[in-house]
Structure formats: C-alpha cells, structure tokens
Curated annotation (Swiss-Prot):
The gene is TOR1A. Residues 45-205 are annotated as: Interaction with SNAPIN. N-glycosylated. This is Torsin-1A. The lineage of its organism: Eukaryota, Metazoa, Chordata, Craniata, Vertebrata. GO terms for biological process: cell adhesion; chaperone-mediated protein folding; ERAD pathway; intermediate filament cytoskeleton organization; neuron projection development; nuclear envelope organization; nuclear membrane organization; organelle organization. It is found in: Endoplasmic reticulum lumen; Nucleus membrane; Cell projection, Growth cone; Cytoplasmic vesicle membrane. It comes from Cricetus cricetus.
Amino acid sequence: AECCGQKRSLSREALQKDLDDKLFGQHLAKKVILNAVSGFLSNPKPKKPLTLSLHGWTGTGKNFASKIIAENIYEGGLNSDYVHLFVATLHFPHASNVTLYKDQLQMWIRGNVSACARSIFIFDEMDKMHAGLIDAIKPFLDYYDVVDEVSYQKAIFIFLSNAGAERITDVALDFWKSGKQREEIKLRDMEHALAVSVFNNKNSGFWHSSLIDRNLIDYFVPFLPLEYKHLKMCIRVEMQSRGYEVDEDIISKVAEEMTFFPKEERVFSDKGC
C-alpha cells in the first residue's frame, strides 16, 4: 500500500519534464506550478497549506495540471488514497443543502488530514459551487498551527474554475492583436485582474469569499486559450499514447476540424484540447 507523505522526495526536474512534455501553450501555469509545488514540498515547516486556483476555459489543461501534480507526489496519482477530488455538480448538487455540505466537507477534510498531513484536495467546477460553501474550509487554509488538534499546514488545495476565463482571453487576444508573442504575457498582466474578477463574479464559487478577502489563495494560475499549433501538439501526444503511428496529415486534419474564435481571425480553439 502507498504511504502517506509522498512516493519520494519530489524531484523538481521530474515535475518540470512532465509539465514540458504534457502541458502545451501554458508558459505561465507551468512556471507558477513548478515553483509553487516544488518550493512548498521542500519546506519542512510551511506556515499554511498550499492553495492554487487554476482558471481558464475547458480543455486548456487545468485538470491535466492537477493530475500531473498528484502523480509527482503520489504513485497512484488521482487514484491515491491521499488525493481527494470534489466535483461541484456531483458532490454538492443542491443549493438547499449547503449547510449540510459545509459540515460534511469539514469532517471529510479533518478526517483525511488527521490520517495523512500531506493530503491533496482538488475542487473541480468551482464556478458551479454554491456561494458560501467554499468558505467552510477557510479555517483549514489559514495561518493556524493547529485547528482542533490537527495541523493542516502540509496539505495542498487546488481549485479548478472557468471563472475569469473571459478576462484571460481578453488579455491573450490583446497581445495577439498587437503582434506580440503569447510567451510575452506575464503573470502580473493577469493575476490581480483575475482575483478581482473571480471575487466579484456571482457564479465563481468564490463570490465575495473570505478566502480571497484574507489572501488565503497563494496563487491564481491563468490557463491561456490554445492556438492551432497547441492542438496539433495535443493530438500528436494522444496518438503516441494510444500506440498509433504519428501521421502529420491526420494531425492537421483533426486540428482543422476544431472550431476557433473570434469567428473571422480563428485564433483560439473553442474547446481547447
């Protein structure tokens, strides 16, 4: 059976290689994730848990990135006993049950962190999370040594959301229109605007959330919309992973069948990879 903690001390190089080989068109996300995760895991006494909020359209790589993080910490990756995935529409479907969900969520997190300090919690579909629910986990994310005799400082919380995606796309499109490379986009072009737009978005799951108010989210990580060349990279890797011979003509054909926006310029893929 797998041990709590991690499969080995995390190798920054292995994480970097995984991100480079598998996550395309996301120079900002790669850099933030690499530094945040490797820095956090090499710190024997973190002051608070690591909290990452990943933002962008469907298909840009948010789930994939959280899978890569999990696999670099635990052999079993997302199937590890120490990695817990919550999907808003599946686990918290009814607005009328928010009080019950809050209690369940607190008990689940407390129980799992008691069993393993290095637990990973992933919240998918944050934008479909009922307002106020996520504030239930605030005590676990704060700068407390212990809460009810449990220390949460080695845990990792990852939030995935489409909220803020319009803002990210606007910035990417502005760069494209002014003839700049997307790699010139800096985190500072995004991060503040992202936090504000998510905080003020009634449908973000973080609407007026104390997690943002109190600066408890360590990193807002933007995932940019993908271009034609990135789709081809995704398709190539997918063909290889399924054992097919890589055929550039087929790759181009598949990529061209995707829909792109804006309608005239056709710069970004509608559905990502």
